[in-house]
Amino acid sequence: MAKQVFQTTFAGRELIVETGQVAKQANGSVVVRYGESTVLTAAVMSKKMATGDFFPLQVNYEEKMYAAGKFPGGFMKREGRPSTDATLTARLIDRPIRPMFAEGFRNEVQVINTVLSYDENASAPMAAMFGSSLALSISDIPFDGPIAGVQVGYVDGQIIINPSQEQAEQSLLELTVAGTKHAINMVESGAKELSEEIMLEALLKGHEAVKELIAFQEEIVAAVGKEKAEVELLHVDADLQAEIIAAYNSDLQKAVQVEEKLAREAATQTVKDQVIAVYEEKYADHEEFDRIMRDVAEILEQMEHAEVRRLITEDKVRPDGRKVDEIRPLDAVVDFLPRVHGSGLFTRGQTQALSVLTLAPMGETQIIDGLDPEYKKRFMHHYNFPQYSVGETGRYGAPGRREIGHGALGERALAQVLPSLEEFPYAIRLVAEVLESNGSSSQASICAGTLALMAGGVPIKAPVAGIAMGLISDGNNYTVLTDIQGLEDHFGDMDFKVAGTRDGITALQMDIKIQGITAEILTEALAQAKKARFEILDVIEATIPEVRPELAPTAPKIDTIKIDVDKIKIVIGKGGETIDKIIAETGVKIDIDEEGNVSIYSSDQDAINRAKEIIAGLVREAKVDEVYRAKVVRIEKFGAFVNLFDKTDALVHISEMAWTRTNNVEDLVAIGDEVDVKVIKIDEKGRVDASMKALLPRPPKPERDEKGEKSERPYRPRHHKDHKPKKEITETPKDSE
């Protein structure tokens, strides 16, 4: 295929798509240029159906450091495992694409996005999402797209599509919305306590922009799209399905309606084991034994799926007996752990999360060095999901994509209410340990995080709570569920997580298994979520009504001082010698930023005070009109040098020592004397002049007589230097001759 170029303008930036030039051996590939961001997307499908009971889709997002003109960090100077941001972007692309493949599709599909050049004002993640959909759409891979996504901001009361970096920094909203031309199918958002009405407006305007991108994709597909390949879909034998349903559907229905999770799982598994045992014996010698048993397992899954949905849509009964808008029993506990800086345990039904707070000096912040300029991340929220939380065994190790994603969602929800660095100069880490799970564990971690922050004395603006909403839809009718449990999440059509305060939403996340949802469903889900959020906040506030006024005794205390930027090198010293000496002497931790903010941390307040004194002395400057108790350190004919403090000396000129005239400095002071001086001048070179006499009483002026005239003083003739007095001649009386 020859190279073809397609071009349009979107959100004020040029959008160019190139096909037929690179990566031509992939099933589909495109180069997307948005602004000066360039992303290569290649989509590949395996030739045969994969084994397993799930669709093996893999979406990667690769950040090449050369795209931003940077070297990779570390010793190897080569890109390694994906960054957290890259992992989250890959999930962001995967989620709207996954529902667009046919039920029963089992061929492995890989979609690889490589960022080749990076423009911080033109969203590379959105270019990658666009490219992923387009590469699949023009390929022969059976994909029921296209889809597209946009970023949405909210600045000065205005909705902005794909905001620039400057606009994003000012925005009260960080929203990504994706979907088809008919409906929204993915949402990811952080927000600064925005109302449901503003969020809905942003979602709908975002979807209007999505439609523009889809129309552009359809134009390209019409020009260069391949005919879709015929692939085998996983279908079960219809006769076998009818046979199993007739024999065992009644037993499975009874098992599904057991209200308690573990008992229900045991009951359904008993029915499934019974069916499997019957058919293993029946077809033990059959040449297609593996296919038949795979069909049996799939049929049982479909039967359970159908019964859960029937109960909710027809009988309006949930598996655990709740109403559609009812929350499971709630419990909140603070101070679950001793010694730590704060802890909260939150339980909702059979979902339970423990959140643990750690406060640290700002030197513990995480340095993020990706395609954007390097920055420091002050707040971290980490989410762990051990297998024992669902009563199973499994792998243990580094967090997977799901754990990273759930941690990021909680981080966005809670970050909106954290105090500023000036108000609370700490690095903050929350770790959520999921101890039990039956759905909505990410939202439980947000509630537990609020408890831990408040118990730990972090002055958050308001408590945050989270709730997960679900959806069961048969095409014509739908039911929105509040606080979905695991079974409803697994067999339902939507997982819509909403977190916020009483004043507004701080985070949204929505994934669906159908191809989209309407504005009507979104409106209803947001309204039900608000009601549920307030109920949970009632429980949190009853447990801990206000943020504690003090930090835990084990938390590091902190004090801050501000120094001039040009004094930073004095405090640090050559090779860090000075600051290391202060730390060794006092036992504190010290952080200094590039603006001269010095943060001193210790559990011992006396140690902090001592370190502050040392630093204040190092950077102290003499000021005009200030008085100092100084020590004479050197004497010259013209005056004495005195030490004001540390390494700062001043000259007291002989004329500034006393009101009476003296010709000898040593008549007034000696080396080692301590004298009070007042600074009277500092010249442009920083040289200090001081005065002793300015602090002494001025001698009285000469007295005046009753007429107000000065009293007479002895006459002292003054002569010009060249004047010679005449010689007096005395005549001798003649009589004396």
From Swiss-Prot:
Binding site for Mg(2+): D489, D495
Obligatory cofactor(s): Mg(2+)
Keywords: Cytoplasm, Magnesium, Metal-binding, Nucleotidyltransferase, RNA-binding, Transferase
InterPro entries, per the entry: ExoRNase_PH_dom1, ExoRNase_PH_dom2, ExoRNase_PH_dom2_sf, KH_dom, KH_dom_type_1, KH_dom_type_1_sf, NA-bd_OB-fold, PNPase
Single GO term (MF): magnesium ion binding
Keyword RNA-binding tagged: yes
One Pfam short name: KH_1
Protein name per UniProt: Polyribonucleotide nucleotidyltransferase
Source lineage: Bacteria, Bacillati, Bacillota, Bacilli, Lactobacillales
